[in-house]
Regions:
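Donor nucleotide-activated moiety binding/catalytic core segment of transferases
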Residues: 192-201, 423-470, 489-493
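Conserved catalytic-core segment of nucleotide-activated headgroup transferases in glycan assembly
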Residues: 356-371, 381-422
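Surface-exposed binding patches on compact interaction domains or structured appendages
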Residues: 53-89
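Bacterial Sec-dependent N-terminal signal peptides
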Residues: 13-38, 109-126
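A nucleotide-sugar donor-handling region in carbohydrate enzymes
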Residues: 272-382
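A short beta-strand micro-motif common to beta-rich folds, especially ectodomain repeats
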Residues: 88, 98-110
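Solvent-exposed, low-complexity, repeat-rich "mucin-like" stalks and linkers
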Residues: 21-26, 33-64
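Active-site and donor-binding regions of nucleotide-sugar-utilizing enzymes
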Residues: 131-170, 174-309, 464-467
Length: 503
């Protein structure tokens, strides 16, 4: 289907393995059936294993993907071998320039096949990828991914578990969106497993077509192990994989505090999580024992240490909300590559045509809501509501709304955004003159980001929305003080002098 993830076929790795002949003669296996060896830009040695039913030989292919016929950066310890098991030591000189590759031709028993060796360029950054992969579960990472996808023109492969977040048919043609059976709901565990295998196959296809390709992975920080599982574990050199770990929202900050907020366990926890990551085979691929359900891709404890490794970064709304008073963890925080990027900044930076495409992807009617804000010359104020478990809670919310209208109604048009589960506010427009009720079921984050220049004040019940809103836009909160807020809102608002605390 147009704009949907194409059905990916498993590559027959004929370039690395001779299949059994029709008469049943044994096959030759190169590197246990893989068809390439990928290493970083440093001077390194690797191995190619050969398991052959007859004597074999290996030569450099004349074309070598545009390189010299006999590159001086690649040395083989043997150019022929006997039947049975053999090993070839492959030595790479340090690469001071662009990525390079060469094709080795193995001949055995009258059959010839190619094996690719490649060496990455040094110093490539997060803007270097030739192909992008986006995998997300939470809403916030999905929105980040959609915004970034529209900021470049590279081929992209996309999966988001909350299928209703975007309309897959509205993605650009260069983006292949993995389909789900229920586009109004969530991807099933079976669909996530199938998606993962399809993504891994596509990565190997791209590597076979373009052995020096650089990959970009944008992934929930809670699923950051996919940077290893999908790429490095399949043999792709980690320097060719630029991983942006996207904040899942409050979980990013709360998990950091839970893991490293206790001085008695913080250092041990950090070292334990670091040891798990470093136990992986980062130089040549391999497989770390899987200790989690594969359909969840979970790696909650890894993103913080991973952000200290090359080619990994943690992108979040506000890095200053990650803090520690313990010297050991404070030092580790300083070593973490964190980028504070607000989604509205990504949206603002897009060309107008790309903004409109994002709104279509997100099923957001910009013109409709912008029109509401332009109906009068007054400034615009939004109140954020909450859910309720009692009549008293419903009455308290109504009292807050009445107070805000009395306090600001003469200078502001008042808009109320109910919680999706709140039905008590349905009668507010009749009860409170001049109040406009916004839809409870709407992409509210996108509403705020898209119309930020038209929103003069926002406030209400504590919400994760405030993490991605400029602090100077927040005028009031329905709470006693910052200390009573959940993390990281307690840190965000502890020095906010402009916020009025209402209880």
């Amino acid at each position: 289907m147009k704009r949907l993830f194409r059905l990916l076929l498993i590559l027959g790795l004929a370039a690395g393995t001779w299949s059994c002949a029709d008469d049943g003669t044994p096959s030759v296996s190169i590197n246990s059936g893989t068809d390439f060896l990928s290493l970083d830009h440093l001077a390194r040695s690797g191995k190619i294993t050969v398991n052959a039913p007859a004597p074999w030989s290996v030569t450099l292919a004349p074309e070598n993907y545009g390189q010299d016929e006999k590159p001086d950066w690649l040395t083989l310890s043997a150019e022929e071998g006997p039947a049975g098991y053999s090993e070839i030591d492959v030595t790479f000189a340090e690469n001071p320039g662009p990525a390079r590759s060469a094709s080795l031709l193995f001949t055995c028993d009258g059959k010839t096949s190619a094996f690719t060796v490649s060496q990455s360029a040094g110093g490539t950054g997060f803007d270097a990828p030739d192909y992008y992969f986006y995998i997300s579960v939470g809403t916030m990472p999905t929105l980040y991914s959609g915004l970034h996808l529209l900021s470049h023109d590279k081929p992209s492969y996309v999966s988001y578990e909350r299928a209703s977040t975007f309309d897959a048919a509205e993605f650009p043609n260069r983006a292949f969106v993995y389909p789900v059976a229920d586009p109004t709901g969530h991807a099933s565990n079976e669909e996530l497993r199938a998606m993962s295998e399809a993504m891994k196959r596509r990565i190997l296809e791209i590597n076979a077509e373009d052995p020096t390709a650089v990959f970009g992975l944008w992934v929930d920080d809670l699923r950051c192990r996919l940077g290893y599982d999908w790429f490095v574990a399949q043999g792709i050199d980690s320097a060719r994989v630029k991983v942006t770990m996207l904040s899942d929202g409050t979980a990013t900050y709360n998990n950091f505090h839970n893991y490293f907020g206790d001085a008695a366990t913080a250092e041990q926890n950090w070292n334990d999580y670091a040891a798990e990551v470093e136990a992986l085979d980062w130089n040549h691929g391999g497989r770390y024992p899987e200790t989690r359900a594969p359909e969840e891709f979970a790696s909650y404890t890894w993103p913080y240490y991973l952000s200290t490794r090359p080619d990994y970064r943690l992108m979040l709304q506000n890095s200053s909300l990650m803090e520690s008073s313990y010297p050991f963890i404070a030092d580790r925080l300083a070593a973490m590559k964190m980028e504070s990027v607000q989604p509205y900044e990504l949206l603002t930076a897009l060309p107008e045509a790309s903004k409109q495409q994002f709104y279509r992807m997100a099923k957001f009617d910009y013109a409709r809501f912008a029109g509401l804000f332009d109906l009068s010359p007054k400034k615009n104020l939004i109140i954020i509501g909450t859910s309720h478990s009692s009549a008293a809670s419903e009455q308290q919310q109504a009292a807050y709304v009445e107070r805000i209208i009395q306090q600001y109604g003469s200078d502001y048009d008042i808009f109320f955004k109910p919680h999706p589960a709140d039905s008590s506010s349905a009668g507010y427009p009749d009860r409170f003159e001049g109040l406009t009720l916004l839809p409870g079921q709407m992409p509210f984050e996108i509403f705020v980001w898209a119309l930020l220049d038209k929103i003069d004040m926002i406030g209400g019940y504590p919400s994760t929305t405030f993490i991605s809103v400029p602090l100077d836009k927040v005028g009031f909160l329905f709470a006693a003080d910052a200390d009573g807020l959940v993390r990281p809102l307690n840190i965000l608002f502890r020095d906010a002098a402009n916020v009025e605390w209402i209880q």
